[in-house]
Amino acid sequence: MGYDAARNYRLQAAEFASPVGVIVQAYEQIIRALQEAARAADRGKFEHKTNETNRALAIVSHLEAMLDHEVGPNVANKLEVFYETMRYQIVKASAERTGERLREVSDYFVPLRDAWRVVEKEHPTPPGAPAPPRRPTPPLTPIDFPADQVLSNWSA
């Protein structure tokens, strides 16, 4: 299956997925992007590694921006800390020349993806049920890191 066909399939799957299914797909995309970035790093394809790493970072940032602190403040706060930590770890791992750390970071997302799969299975959206209202997608913003943790040299 070509890239465009696979992309179209994923877009169509996301369009018809339940809200929980969309979260599962987001985690799958993060894991896939980090694994691909790791393979690219191992092959010395640093531009591809950077593109895949940026893709993972964008998805993590989007998930964080969509957290609803009013509905579930405890869970939202914990996920926010997790996402912030993972963004930092992704950037740190991306600075390395091998894919080992990127693979390790991708492994942190697997238990969350699997937990959301259980939620999706145990509490499916009934057929024909209206989707919950979508919150507007916030614009992606640069990631803020403490000054002592900023990577000053991004050369591969």
Predicted regions and their residues:
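Short terminal interaction segments
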Residues: 1-16, 106-156
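N-terminal first-folded block
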Residues: 16-48
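Soluble N-terminal interaction domains of secretory/endomembrane membrane proteins
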Residues: 9-13, 29-32, 38-39, 58, ...
